[in-house]
């Protein structure tokens, strides 16, 4: 699996005002989740020279290597996340250099997980992946969160676009929350928005997260799972979902099992009630939850 996303340093302030510094971003949450499934992980990422040796050692000890050429002059991407009772505020503190087409050349993988955190995957890089995928028929999963984010030049506070005219040609699967789904579909939501991405954009697997539900649309089947968990920190849950879904589908070629493993991984992570990367769940706990959801998942033939 190759993951395109910047590694980030997160400063997470919880409801009580406590601040936790943690490595983060899809590269870390998704990469470490994929390692739990026994997958080889290649990160297409960049960090700054401020990225500490202990962080490099931590990733290496968990089977993920940061190569020398991935360390650049720009600072490592950093966010401050403030978690309140009813909402979360995100601020960009520093941003690393964008990824380039040269960064993805000579990478051999059966799955691309494209999940920018703040526009570091330009349109030409995404197009190059899709073009390469057309030749090899690999799996391309997209999480559009980084394309949605707009940074206030004065405060660094991040807001979201209302409209995202993103070319989804060649994308195999997409994960989108309520705001992302509306931006990608011209304001549509729920099942209607998912069907639009499938029929009009050609996305084979559409995953939607809204409130405490995870939905999957594949062909004419709509599946949904309820996650009713109160947690102090859900940072990285979407990244864990995307990676677990990809791993399970690549291994089993069964979308039903894949969404059960995705939801199972999210539940296992949130049940730890830990912050940052400490919430990465074990494979055994993921499997336990996946088997439970396989027997309780709701579905509808459209």
Task: Kindly give the residue locations of the regions a language model identified.
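Conserved N-terminal subdomain of the carbohydrate kinase-like
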Residues: 9-21, 36-116, 120, 125-139, ...
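Short internal beta-strands
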Residues: 42-47, 141-145, 174-178
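Conserved phosphate/ATP/ADP-binding segment of small-molecule kinases
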Residues: 146-225
